[in-house]
Amino acid sequence: MALTAKTKQELIEEFKTHDSDTGSPEVQVALLTNRITYLTEHFKTHKKDHHSRRGLLKLVGQRRRLLNYLKNKDVQRYRTLIEALGLRK
């Protein structure tokens, strides 16, 4: 399975902005990145799984929208997040 409850909780703990944070853009992007990474590995062995590929493209688009929102709202938080997740070179 891609995202166990334990893994999800660890990601939330790492990227939360306050104690009861589960929905901030940072947390959402971290969770999406984890799912995207899992699906990318899945496609290395299942090249013809086009239904899941469409889901991957939707996840990438959603992550892109969240990152754009964060960049427009607070550039420093955006830069910190992409550095922590290793999204840009």
Swiss-Prot record:
SUPFAM superfamilies: S15/NS1 RNA-binding domain (SSF47060). The keyword Repeat does not apply. InterPro entries: Ribosomal_uS15, Ribosomal_uS15_bac-type, uS15_NS1_RNA-bd_sf. GO terms for molecular function: rRNA binding; structural constituent of ribosome. GO terms for biological process: translation. The keyword Ribosomal protein applies. Keywords: Ribonucleoprotein, Ribosomal protein, RNA-binding, rRNA-binding. GO terms for cellular component: cytosolic small ribosomal subunit. Pfam families: Ribosomal_S15. Disulfide bonds: none annotated. SMART domains: Ribosomal_S15. Belongs to the universal ribosomal protein uS15 family. One of the primary rRNA binding proteins, it binds directly to 16S rRNA where it helps nucleate assembly of the platform of the 30S subunit by binding and bridging several RNA helices of the 16S rRNA. Forms an intersubunit bridge (bridge B4) with the 23S rRNA of the 50S subunit in the ribosome. Part of the 30S ribosomal subunit. Forms a bridge to the 50S subunit in the 70S ribosome, contacting the 23S rRNA. This is Small ribosomal subunit protein uS15. It comes from Desulfatibacillum aliphaticivorans. The lineage of its organism: Bacteria, Pseudomonadati, Thermodesulfobacteriota, Desulfobacteria, Desulfobacterales. The gene is rpsO.
